[in-house]
């Protein structure tokens, strides 16, 4: 049983209501510059610099000597990219030992890239300093063995610019950018937003209308596809949209695990950005590398359906805990799947074969009291 540490950041057990529990701290707001506008910045006593830059002439903070600099083609060729889970200690901080083990498992299982701090990795529950630290840690420890793609997208163009600058500065190979969510913008606004971040480095655009509330129209993607740093699109709309793009030579990764086999082999997708590969990286590699395999796809569909029975990453967090590879700690607002679903997962593992899953421990059904839910961290 995982017990919460009696500190200022207490873990909260499932079923126990904390009176007046506080929400997670807000994400650190990032801006292009904390200083006054550059146009009014004085250099020397009483003199304006001849090289003063106005806000209309903003220069991206980039370097040709960035660690692990990779080509856009080096990103376009990736077939299996795992949207990796972020594990936690009982007080809600990152469990880096468990995280390192997860990344090593992905490398050994044949994944070619990882998304750090994406939806699956709960980047939306991180402060920006946590987010960039985890990207940097992944690059420093594993960047020579796997492509590190940092989720530095935001619904604020300002934050997306600053986070991408920092992500590339610490060595990430590419950025993942979602379209601005909640405060949705126009078609012209979408192009303007991506126009600001594409100069930073290789970029994958992520279209997931079920989460953002806005579908990125094909006209926008087609316009952006001419940009040198545009690597491709993680597309969640479906096969018809995938084929629309691949017919035009645009690189596409399926964002839907249950569609990725057909997207890859029937509709021209390059590969998948996967949640399921956190659990069975070797089988997902086979699905993406070894040609059409309807039998394997059919075998994995019950697992994929189970994983998304509640919004991602609830299922994945529950599964990895029951496999014994991460602590059963959830940052709120996430909570584990029901006991019925936890029991069903054990049956799915037995049907596919425990040897195909990550970790070495026997899969087991965790009790409600085994889980720790964190509100303050």
Swiss-Prot record:
It catalyses: L-aspartate 4-semialdehyde + pyruvate = (2S,4S)-4-hydroxy-2,3,4,5-tetrahydrodipicolinate + H2O + H(+). The keyword Nucleotide-binding does not apply. It comes from the Eukaryota. Its main location: plastid. It is found in: Plastid, Chloroplast. Tetramer of modified subunits derived from two genes in different combinations. This is 4-hydroxy-tetrahydrodipicolinate synthase 2, chloroplastic. It comes from Triticum aestivum (Wheat). The lineage of its organism: Eukaryota, Viridiplantae, Streptophyta, Embryophyta, Tracheophyta.
